[in-house]
């Protein structure tokens, strides 16, 4: 398995994908920070850092994060079809399951620094604004970890779509539609988002709730993410 991962990691266009991820994060962060500071004067003391977190993560997790994951999944998979290397690998009895798992691990390592950068932006913005954290920093780190976990069902879903269509644009288009449907579900009945794959990063980051999950919410979150990841990984 190690050899599969190293082979995939070596040929991954890491700089290109990181630049894309940082660009998406920068754009969503500007929106969130702009809204926060525009309404800074009307915020109640003791809630500022939570509102900052909510604004900073909401537009990222709902609007741009799923398409970003679709782009990463697409750029990891589509070149294999264009070069027709999959047929050659199958002929040489290379394990497609291990190959795909190597790509999933590569995507995780690409997403990790982007999400850590999101946490850093939050910390720096809070320091600039001169506010203290309403919750411990460890809590926000935990929410970042949950957002990483919730990335897997989207990546596996987007990989499934990309493999079936062999088309980069269609995969990104589906993720964009998924992001818009997430907004619709929020306004119709937010409870539906608990079972919608494109809503999972928002739930993991607690962008709307702004408080820790209860035990039952955590179990449901883990179950939904495992089920979706397993279904589309197959």
Regions found by a protein language model. Give the residues of each.
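Aromatic- and glycine-rich beta-strand/loop motifs that create alpha-glucan
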Residues: 1-25
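Cytoplasmic juxtamembrane interface segments
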Residues: 1-10, 77-90, 144, 148-169
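Pore- or pathway-lining transmembrane helices of multi-pass membrane proteins that form conduits
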Residues: 20-26, 165-183
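Secretory targeting signals
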Residues: 24-69, 101-166, 205-220
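Terminal transmembrane helical anchor/hairpin motif
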Residues: 34-53, 172-234
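Hydrophobic/aromatic residues in alpha-helical transmembrane segments
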Residues: 69-73, 121, 157-158, 197, ...
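Helix-loop-helix units of permease transmembrane domains in multi-pass membrane transporters
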Residues: 76-108
